[in-house]
């Protein structure tokens, strides 16, 4: 299905509007002169850990301990993330390192 030029322009305008709205809305709602509300500060503290926990559970939900590789690559990859983070305290390094360990195990070992 092809779109007419008008439909294409409307689609592009809506995407631009949506992108700009999500970028600028926080600055309009919370101007720099006012203090940030306590609930927003609270969410800023608890949401990162909650999101990471949710992602870990989502990634491990289909791991079968009774078949295939018995979840060994996932366990070793998760352990690599934990150990790298305890050692270097760098989230990007931890996630990237755990991903590399997991992919090497899945592609070359199991």
Curated annotation (Swiss-Prot):
<dbReference type="InterPro" id="IPR008407">
    <property type="entry name" value="Brnchd-chn_aa_trnsp_AzlD"/>
</dbReference>
<comment type="function">
    <text>Involved in branched-chain amino acid transport.</text>
</comment>
<keyword id="KW-1133">Transmembrane helix</keyword>
<keyword id="KW-0813">Transport</keyword>
<keyword id="KW-0472">Membrane</keyword>
<feature type="transmembrane region" description="Helical">
    <location>
        <begin position="46"/>
        <end position="66"/>
    </location>
</feature>
<dbReference type="Pfam" id="PF05437">
    <property type="entry name" value="AzlD"/>
</dbReference>
<dbReference type="GO" id="GO:0005886">
    <property type="term" value="C:plasma membrane"/>
</dbReference>
<comment type="similarity">
    <text>Belongs to the AzlD/HI_1737/HP1330 family.</text>
</comment>
<keyword id="KW-0029">Amino-acid transport</keyword>
<protein>
    <recommendedName>
        <fullName>Branched-chain amino acid transport protein AzlD</fullName>
    </recommendedName>
</protein>
<dbReference type="GO" id="GO:0006865">
    <property type="term" value="P:amino acid transport"/>
</dbReference>
<keyword id="KW-0812">Transmembrane</keyword>
<keyword id="KW-1003">Cell membrane</keyword>
<feature type="transmembrane region" description="Helical">
    <location>
        <begin position="10"/>
        <end position="30"/>
    </location>
</feature>
């Amino acid at each position: 299905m092809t779109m007419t030029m008008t439909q294409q322009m409307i689609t592009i305008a809506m995407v631009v509007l949506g992108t700009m709205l999500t970028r600028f809305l926080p600055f309009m709602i919370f101007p720099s002169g006012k203090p940030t509300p306590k609930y927003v500060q609270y969410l800023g503290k608890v949401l990162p850990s909650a999101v990471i926990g949710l992602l870990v559970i989502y990634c491990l939900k289909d791991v079968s301990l009774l078949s295939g590789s018995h979840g060994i690559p996932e366990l070793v990859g998760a352990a690599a993330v934990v150990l790298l983070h305890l050692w270097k305290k760098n989230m990007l390094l931890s996630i990237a390192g755990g991903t590399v360990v997991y992919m090497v195990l899945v592609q070359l070992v199991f």
